[in-house]
């Protein structure tokens, strides 16, 4: 199911290059969102997506409600583990919305201080993932994704027990009754509708959760193919900062051709794992190389507004931004 959905998205990207190039501003009054999660809607249509960072509470959320980005990466790995602030941030996004594309909010993906280092660690801390989802966030990025069994526990934490399709290798989900109230209000749907949509995409084609991994150290790198293959995962990155620390090499946020050969090899290995498992690859994009990155296979751009604007024009995006 996952491989089919993402393969179709890649075909869609090639087709967009043949479509007429209409300006985003001309469409903004007529475009009708097809999904809750703007980032998933774009990926499913074969379009790369671009993000910005976020933190704080209500006022910060309201300020970012009109962001240029497709999604906001809300920092909790090294920032405060403050679920009240996160809930207020989401409320601010709603009050400041909708987006230019007509979505109620930009998508919000939260990085966790919980790590994918072992099944036991993830199982003991699955409640952190659940508290994030209770805020109305649209996804989670799990750092140091070393152990496939930990990744399975991560996905379980983001599913209801009766979620479809069933995946025997995952086991049943861990979300419980009562978790649908606040997020359904943030999403602007009923609690019953939320429970149907609160599931990872593309495992569930109708799911609105976007789950990702940071394959960002030598231990995770050794298992890159295995962790990327876990059903329910939609994207991964190679974590050039932490990867450099793990390999005792310089930081890898520079252009690919400037990196140490061992860092280039690590990046290539994560990119290959993403392609093999039909999930999106996240990488830094710059105005001077965003088109090259897209051609290489990057589907999530970490960079500024200028790079995003150029990338959207390059792929002839139809959704307003």
Regions found by a protein language model. Give the residues of each.
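Bacterial N-terminal signal peptides that target proteins for export
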Residues: 1-7
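Bacterial N-terminal signal peptides
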Residues: 7-16
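Expand to "…catalyze enediolate/carbanion chemistry for C-C bond making/breaking, isomerization
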Residues: 18, 22-321
């Amino acid at each position: 199911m996952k491989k089919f959905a993402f393969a179709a998205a890649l075909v869609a990207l090639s087709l967009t290059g043949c479509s007429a190039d209409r300006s985003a501003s001309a469409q903004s009054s007529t475009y009708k969102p097809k999904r809750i999660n703007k980032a998933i809607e774009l990926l499913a249509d074969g379009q790369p997506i671009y993000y910005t960072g976020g933190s704080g509470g209500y006022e910060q959320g309201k300020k970012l409600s009109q962001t240029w980005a497709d999604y906001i990466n809300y920092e909790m790995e090294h920032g405060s583990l403050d679920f009240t602030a996160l809930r207020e941030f989401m409320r601010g996004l709603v009050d400041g919305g909708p987006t230019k594309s007509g979505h109620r909010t930009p998508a919000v993906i939260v990085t966790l201080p919980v790590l994918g280092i072992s099944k036991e660690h993830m199982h003991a801390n699955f409640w952190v993932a659940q508290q994030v989802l209770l805020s109305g966030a649209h996804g989670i990025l799990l750092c140091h994704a070393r152990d496939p069994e930990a990744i399975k526990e991560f996905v379980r934490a983001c599913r209801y027990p009766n979620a479809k399709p069933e995946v025997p290798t995952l086991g049943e989900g861990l979300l419980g009754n009562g978790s649908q109230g606040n997020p359904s209000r943030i999403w602007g749907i009923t609690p019953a509708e939320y429970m149907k949509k609160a599931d990872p995409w593309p495992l569930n084609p109708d799911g609105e959760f976007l789950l990702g991994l940071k394959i960002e150290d030598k231990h995770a790198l050794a298992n890159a193919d295995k962790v990327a293959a876990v059903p329910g995962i939609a994207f991964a990155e190679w974590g050039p900062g932490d990867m450099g620390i793990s390999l005792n090499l310089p930081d890898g946020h520079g252009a690919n051709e400037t990196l140490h050969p061992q860092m280039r090899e690590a990046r290539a290995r994560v990119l290959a794992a993403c392609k093999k498992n039909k999930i999106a690859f996240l990488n830094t994009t710059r105005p001077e190389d965003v088109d090259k990155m897209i051609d290489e296979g990057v589907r999530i751009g970490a960079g500024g507004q200028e790079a995003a604007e150029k990338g959207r024009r390059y792929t002839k995006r139809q959704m307003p931004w």
